[in-house]
């Protein structure tokens, strides 16, 4: 599997990493990094949210639905405008999941979600807390027109998302613009 299909876990939160499962979202050729149930299971494993019950094709559809409900709400939040009420309603449907229980083993752990729907509910709750709490001030959007990836930037110094390709393209474009001006 090529680099373009590799999951990204550098956006600053699990829900932001869910957004990154679709790369170059606004480009001509978006990259779906979670095209199958198996890839959804891999992703849920990586974020320690693998459900007890088997993940289905319907769960994959729900994961895509959550991701695409979150994206416009996150972009609106970063832009400082109210999100579309239909998207907020779509996101709200994921908030009715099971509650989280904790247990102590060699460390504090949460019990695994029973279903993929419960796992997605946990991700939605994290997103809502992030989007409505003080950490929303740390959210940024990649300026690359085909990316527009949302990421957390507590330092306030990052210009592009964590994807090195976006930063490289942006720097090359800026260099060419400076060079053209000096000629």
Across the structure, where does each feature detected by a protein language model lie?
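Basic DNA-binding region of bZIP-type proteins
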Residues: 165-182
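Cysteine-rich micro-motifs
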Residues: 157-167
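A structural preference for long, well-packed, hydrophobic secondary-structure segments
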Residues: 138-140, 157, 176
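Short helix-coil boundary/hinge micro-motifs
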Residues: 1-141, 148-152, 183
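Short, cysteine/histidine-rich loop/knuckle motifs that typically chelate Zn2+
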Residues: 141-146, 163-165
């Amino acid at each position: 599997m090529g680099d373009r299909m590799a999951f990204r876990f550098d956006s600053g939160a699990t829900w932001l990493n869910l957004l990154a499962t679709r790369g170059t979202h606004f480009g001509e050729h978006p990259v779906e990094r979670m095209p199958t149930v198996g890839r959804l299971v891999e992703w849920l494993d990586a974020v320690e949210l693998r459900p007890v019950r088997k993940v289905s094709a319907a769960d994959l559809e729900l994961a895509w639905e959550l991701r695409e409900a979150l994206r416009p709400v996150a972009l609106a939040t970063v832009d400082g405008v109210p999100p579309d009420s239909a998207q907020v309603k779509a996101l709200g449907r994921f908030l009715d999941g099971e509650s989280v229980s904790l247990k102590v083993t060699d460390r504090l752990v949460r019990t695994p979600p029973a279903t993929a729907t419960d796992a997605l509910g946990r991700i939605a709750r994290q997103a809502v807390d992030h989007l409505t709490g003080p950490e929303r001030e740390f959210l940024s959007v990649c300026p690359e027109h085909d990316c527009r990836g949302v990421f957390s930037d507590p330092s306030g110094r990052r210009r592009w998302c964590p994807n090195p390709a976006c930063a490289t393209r942006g720097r090359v474009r800026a260099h060419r613009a400076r060079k053209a001006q000096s000629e």
